[in-house]
């Protein structure tokens, strides 16, 4: 006899009159007038089991059941009595009349009820095994599996092969901090866990494996946020002999296919926007296009005004002044004084010193129709031009950002999203509840690192410049555009990629632009430079964050809800208590001595 014939959640009226054997966990036990009802749960859902006192032995076992007991049930599938069906369940039209009931393993009293939606994250992560039994988490894990399965099916159908790359590699401290692994055999030397298989997948292209993929763990020792983990999973892909547009077309098709087949979601065609346009209109390289608000550029206009807050920002090197028009925000029933005050505090998180605003009571009345502490500091012509450029109407409110470009983009860009997602924004039609995908292209090749006083790569130093931009690396690196692209969905970067450098002389030129000496480049990347000299093909690829992808599909607030055993924001595993101290003997074998850190008095 089989230990199990069916999953609990898949027992339907199609099995009516048949005897089934089920295994699962007691979700709830109810005693109704001498008859005991048990909801038994497994990964597919619930089934209602009925224990009748006529079967004394079975009934005696049922009387002693408690939540989370692991049980085996054999019984007859029959229709539920009229009026007791549950349309929310696949098994909601049937019940199982219990013939045999066996406790496979009892359970101690759980520390929480699995249907408690108000648990702290600490409690959930400490008791992660129980948390993973919750139906919502089971759905998340099953969807994650479906996403990886559909990804593999698509890539296999398109000729990609799954090749594993090393977990123990060389540390290249140009990006985020590495997780280091000390070598016992090579005293004083360290491996690094991969932040990405970037260089290995490029080497595979040189080796002739023209379509590679891997669903792979990556590691970064960085400060954590809601959408970051020290170890994360990415869908890593590289291909030879495809142009940038062909790469984007292929992997847009893959993502649309995965959403449709794994989650029943039809994504629209991905529009394309340049990095410059995204920053100009939205202050972000991953704009949330569901929010119907855009910046109005005012930098040139504000150069001539006497109001120093605006004119100083407009005339400083790298300064910017923008307005954000919020339709209806200044009208009766619009943004309250408290909300405006809260937004003024909110932008300070991003380095803004404050948030100037103008309420438009009567756009046609000039100065008299405007309400704001700053109106007195602006001349009539400038006020009229602000109204004209923003297209402001009666009842609108205008918010202003004036500072260094990065601060303005970050602060007003975040404000735009916050207002759009607010109750006011949704009520006022400023938020379009839809799937809003996007390709952002034509990123700058370099950005200037003020602290290090040198140029650094925006994506990574292996990204190819756009055709005709190679010489700009020497003469005007700030104007050099990369063949890089990011895949954005609902304001979240799902993945990014680029066409890679496939010629050694261009790669060496990039290293020089980044002030990496020839000796240093040979020491850190000599294996790549050597490989590029052996007829390396044109190639490019993309890496898509699996955790973020599933988080978006499920609507989860954090990627911790779509990872089976995640770390906290302090990079700890509360279930296993990792990281933890190790024995002195282990440290000696690894040639490591811990410094005694003095505790502050």
Curated annotation (Swiss-Prot):
Enzyme Commission number(s): 6.1.1.23
Keywords of the record: Aminoacyl-tRNA synthetase, ATP-binding, Cytoplasm, Ligase, Nucleotide-binding, Protein biosynthesis
Alphabetical GO biological process terms: aspartyl-tRNA aminoacylation
Cellular localization per UniProt: Cytoplasm
Cellular component, GO annotation: cytoplasm
Binding site for ATP: 220-222, 229, 493, 545-548
Binding site for L-aspartate: 174, 220, 459, 500
Stretches for region Aspartate: 198-201
SUPFAM superfamilies xref list: Class II aaRS and biotin synthetases, GAD domain-like, Nucleic acid-binding proteins
UniProt main location, coarse: cytoplasm
A Pfam short name: GAD
Self-association and partners: Homodimer.
Function text: Aspartyl-tRNA synthetase with relaxed tRNA specificity since it is able to aspartylate not only its cognate tRNA(Asp) but also tRNA(Asn). Reaction proceeds in two steps: L-aspartate is first activated by ATP to form Asp-AMP and then transferred to the acceptor end of tRNA(Asp/Asn).
HAMAP family (alphabetical): Asp_tRNA_synth_type1
UniProt protein name: Aspartate--tRNA(Asp/Asn) ligase
Source organism per UniProt: Variovorax paradoxus (strain S110)
